[in-house]
Amino acid sequence: MTGETMLCRRVRLVRGNHDAHAGDPPREWRVTCVDEPYAMPPFLACHHATRPPSGYALCGHVHPGIRVATAGESARLPCFVLGRERAILPAFGRFTGLADIAPMRDERIVAVAGLALFELPAMSQNCNA
């Protein structure tokens, strides 16, 4: 068995707000559904953006986005919000939308543009635009 095959053998889905209505995936998909926080030391997989008392939270509910602008052009891009206690992960796809975010002082913004990632300078982080 290759490393790639092994990686695909265990899928964990942290239940979120839409799952109460949609329900768990069919059993034949072999997806294990878990409630938050799901411990994967040193990480906690969380649906909601939280700051845990211990561990590092990987959060997904917010679908953070940022507006970046140049002279005459602007774009809204998905972004990562990275801090000392948590990372808020972007959603990829048009169905989810993007939420304007306001990072905490200890958090950095890394925007996603196609296949490129770029960290925004702290002084240009205007996430409520």
Please describe what each predicted stretch is.
Residues 1-129:
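Extended recognition/assembly regions associated with phosphoester-bond processing machinery
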